[in-house]
């Protein structure tokens, strides 16, 4: 396989090769994934990072997106970095940031309102109150004749809409989660339901927004009171940025003097973004740069943005796991589409619930702790038995570290005093 043009550049010239790599990828659309995982180019980028990183200082960069967290763990990117370059995990996993109270709302819709709840697979496994989860509720439905509801795992919101059309006798609720990437498809579903005149379809909207979460990491008192982490810059999310563009991040560069580099999900994307951030920090600059130019523009997707603004509006406040109540950080369904708002149709309300006291998921989401610093990581809390939401999704920091061998330094005897552990139960 012929390497991208960038591999033929001297190591010191690699920072300017983002355009060359993206151009090469665009010309070879069927082969570019292999090129973005090329070992020789990765070694060149690793050497460039080592050369650029000043030995007299530390660099602390947050990858906001769970997809980047997954890629960093899967490809061992941190093993290629010098010891003074640190990657901090952020709150960019949509399943992870859902608070327990939101899962409880979905459970009440099933158990009390008797709806058919349609959800992606990961939310079904998120721990809720009383040791429950949506998956455990689904298992109980077949045993308890008093429960009228139903739970179905789907791969697309369109599956929920189709199910509602096929079963007009059932009230079907779609559990809509995610950042700006998944919001436009939900808007399409609601518009389609309105056009079809469906009276048995509604959405439990849990869509959240990226910029307010980044702002909370940098400035919110809700985060400061729990402790936060000093950051030198951000790797901006890839898919989110295809929708909102790079313009919303300019505020963080201008107001907080934090550089942002939007990057793709491949290992070379991430490594190049780290190198670009180091170069900015060394030069005392704070700019928004776009490494992912093959898919992201400054303006983003205007059509998707217009669709979202037509169907949704800002919530005054929304509770995030680990970050608390953040103002104007999530979306709700506009009054014009209120017939399809499950919160209004079934009068279900959010009730705050504290996380498990042994779980450090909130601290991991704020960047205060690494997964291995949680005393139950890799022992009591595993992907098969998640105690916190960060161990549920493959984009969660804890699940990513566990799945790709980053759990070897988990705290010894972590489960010794944990209720319900094999040692505790004898």
Regions picked out by a protein language model, each given a short descriptive name:
Residues 224-297:
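A conserved active-site cap/scaffold subdomain adjacent to cofactor or substrate pockets
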Residues 58-61, 200-201, 284-293, 319-321, ...:
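Flexible, glycine/charged-enriched surface loops at secondary-structure junctions
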Residues 27-169, 183, 187, 195-196, ...:
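Metallocofactor- and cofactor-centric catalytic cores in central/energy metabolism, strongly enriched
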Residues 18-19:
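Residue-level detector of structural "landmarks"
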Residues 271-363:
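Internal helical hairpin/lid segments
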Residues 175, 179-248:
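Phosphate/pyrophosphate-binding betaalpha-module
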């Amino acid at each position: 396989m012929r390497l991208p043009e960038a591999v033929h550049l001297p190591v010191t010239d690699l920072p300017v090769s983002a355009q060359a790599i993206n151009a090469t990828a665009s010309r070879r659309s069927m082969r570019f994934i292999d090129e973005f995982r090329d070992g020789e180019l990765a070694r060149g980028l690793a050497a460039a990072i080592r050369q650029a990183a000043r030995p007299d200082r530390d660099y602390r960069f947050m990858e906001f997106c769970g997809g980047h967290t997954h890629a960093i763990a899967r490809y061992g990117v941190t093993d290629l970095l010098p010891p003074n370059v640190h990657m901090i995990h952020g709150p960019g996993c949509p399943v992870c940031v859902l608070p327990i109270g939101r899962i409880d709302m979905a459970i009440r819709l099933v158990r009390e309102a008797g709806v058919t709840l349609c959800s992606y697979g990961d939310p079904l496994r998120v721990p809720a109150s009383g040791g429950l989860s949506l998956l455990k509720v689904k298992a109980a439905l077949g045993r308890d004749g008093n429960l009228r509801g139903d739970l179905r795992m789907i791969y697309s919101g369109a599956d929920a809409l189709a199910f509602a059309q096929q079963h007009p006798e059932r009230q079907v609720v779609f559990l809509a989660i995610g950042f700006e990437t998944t919001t436009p498809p939900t808007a399409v579903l609601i518009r389609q339901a309105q056009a079809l005149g469906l009276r048995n379809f509604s959405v439990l909207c849990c869509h959240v927004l990226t910029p307010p979460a980044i702002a909370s990491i940098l400035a919110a008192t809700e985060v400061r009171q729990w402790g936060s982490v000093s950051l030198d810059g951000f790797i901006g999310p890839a898919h989110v940025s295809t929708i909102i563009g790079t313009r919303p991040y300019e505020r963080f560069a201008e107001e907080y003097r934090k550089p942002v580099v939007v990057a793709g999900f491949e290992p070379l994307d991430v490594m190049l973004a780290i190198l670009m951030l180091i170069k900015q920090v060394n030069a005392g600059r704070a700019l928004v740069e776009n490494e992912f130019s093959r898919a992201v523009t400054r303006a983003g997707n205007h059509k998707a943005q217009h669709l979202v603004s037509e169907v949704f509006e800002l919530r005054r406040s929304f509770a995030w796991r680990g970050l608390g109540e953040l103002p104007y950080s999530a979306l709700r369904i506009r009054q014009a589409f209120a017939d399809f708002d499950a919160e209004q149709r079934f009068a279900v309300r959010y009730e705050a619930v504290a996380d498990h006291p042994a779980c450090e998921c909130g601290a991991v989401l704020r960047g205060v702790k690494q997964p291995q610093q949680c005393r139950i990581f890799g022992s009591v809390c595993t992907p098969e038995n998640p105690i916190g939401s960060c161990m549920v999704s493959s984009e969660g920091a804890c699940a990513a570290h566990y799945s790709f061998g980053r759990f070897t330094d988990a705290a010894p005897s972590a489960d010794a005093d944990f209720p319900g552990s094999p040692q505790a139960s004898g």
